[in-house]
Amino acid sequence: MPKKAASPEIKAASFETSLSELEQIVTRLESGELPLEDALNEFERGVQLARQGQQTLLQAEQRVQILLSDDVDAPLKPFTPDTE
């Protein structure tokens, strides 16, 4: 079965919008109140959003590495987020 291309709505949505929608999907799925078919549709949409988000993050990481590599004095280091 060939892979489906990401739907246009996902591509047009910002990362933040997609993340918000994904959080809402998780909440609905965790409630356990959706009929099976609706839950499967929500799950499918969630997987699409998660994959798109992963791709967006990968592209952002690559852009940062490219920007840092333009400065020969800036060593590449693994990104570690601030923990508060």
From Swiss-Prot:
Highest taxon of the lineage: Bacteria
InterPro entries the record matches: Exonuc_VII_S, Exonuc_VII_ssu_sf
Entry EC no(s): 3.1.11.6
Keyword Metal-binding belongs to the record: no
GO cellular component, one term: exodeoxyribonuclease VII complex
Catalytic activity: Exonucleolytic cleavage in either 5'- to 3'- or 3'- to 5'-direction to yield nucleoside 5'-phosphates
EC class of the enzyme, as a word: hydrolase
Keywords annotated in UniProt: Cytoplasm, Exonuclease, Hydrolase, Nuclease
Pfam families registered for this protein in UniProt: Exonuc_VII_S
GO molecular function: exodeoxyribonuclease VII activity
Compartment(s) of residence: Cytoplasm
Subunit structure: Heterooligomer composed of large and small subunits.
Xref: HAMAP family: Exonuc_7_S (MF_00337)
Name the UniProt record assigns to this protein: Exodeoxyribonuclease 7 small subunit
Species: Yersinia pestis
